């Protein structure tokens, strides 16, 4: 709103209010929030480092680029039970559930920037079974699997 001062026909001051609407050229989407459980997983990723897997860098990048993904997970193998007491976390595969439209950008970033040895996609019935939803049954690029040797 914009207030202006003017005089009426009798010479008395009059206050006019002029409504002004500003429409941004780019639609403003609400900021995505990282859930508490996802923060725990990002902390685990940040603490994991081996060969070319630089967990701290990957977790930092994922936090800054949260608009590109729905969830990330670095599951461990049961061999971790043996060595966890010594502080070792045996995990070599990062799973990313991307936001639509960011699938191939995320794959390229994992390969080029973070030197994943292999990347592949989980889609169709396998993705449906893993996520427990039929919404992804007809999609080929649902979960990005990035593996480091």
Regions found by a protein language model. Give the residues of each.
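Acidic, proline/glycine-rich low-complexity IDRs
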Residues: 117-149
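Long, contiguous N-terminal structural blocks used for assembly/anchoring
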Residues: 2-118
